[in-house]
């Protein structure tokens, strides 16, 4: 953020709280809809989830598993929306599915906010650094359609209102689906 956009990176929760407060008081000059649009924020840790609870209509956690969904719902309570992201790979061969997942995971495994969250979820530094099978199995859903459906159901049973799936291409090309 600082290097590319020349923005000052501050404490995430304080920065987001200030942004939400400024957004709430900004003039709105377009034609109003009958209902105001919902505001959800990307939230992983307990403090950001608490901010989502108190200042928005919900949270959108990214790159997590059902155990995180349970924790997020416990913090949010019953009212706010919980719309989680789940990466899915339609591949039944465990070794192949995990190998397809690893290049995607490598994009994120050095970012402190994700690392901290995965540690909170019970993964180890070794799991994260080496993109272990345990890490992949916790953060990706892979298998046949029934296995993917089961993982989505695990999120729903853990308290998700909606599961946003992110298909990972089985041909290894990001952004291009082959199924």
What are these regions (language model features)?
Residues 1-179:
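Active-site-adjacent structural elements that line small-molecule/cofactor binding pockets in enzymes
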């Amino acid at each position: 953020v600082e290097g590319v956009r020349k923005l000052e990176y501050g404490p995430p929760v304080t920065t987001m709280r200030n942004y939400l407060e400024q957004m709430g008081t900004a003039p709105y000059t377009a034609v109003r809809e009958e209902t105001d649009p919902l505001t959800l924020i990307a939230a992983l840790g307990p403090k950001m989830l608490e901010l989502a609870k108190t200042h928005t209509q919900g949270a959108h956690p990214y790159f997590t598993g059902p155990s995180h969904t349970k924790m997020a719902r416990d913090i949010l309570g019953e009212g706010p929306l919980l719309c989680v992201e789940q990466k899915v790979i339609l591949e039944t061969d465990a070794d192949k599915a995990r190998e397809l997942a690893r290049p995607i995971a490598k994009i994120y495994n050095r970012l402190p906010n994700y690392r901290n969250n995965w540690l909170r979820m019970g993964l180890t530094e070794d799991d994260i650094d080496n993109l272990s099978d345990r890490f992949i199995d916790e953060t990706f859903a892979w298998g046949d359609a029934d296995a993917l459906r089961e993982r989505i159901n695990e999120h729903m049973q853990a308290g998700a209102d909606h599961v946003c799936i992110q298909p990972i291409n089985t041909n290894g090309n990001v952004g291009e689906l082959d199924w």
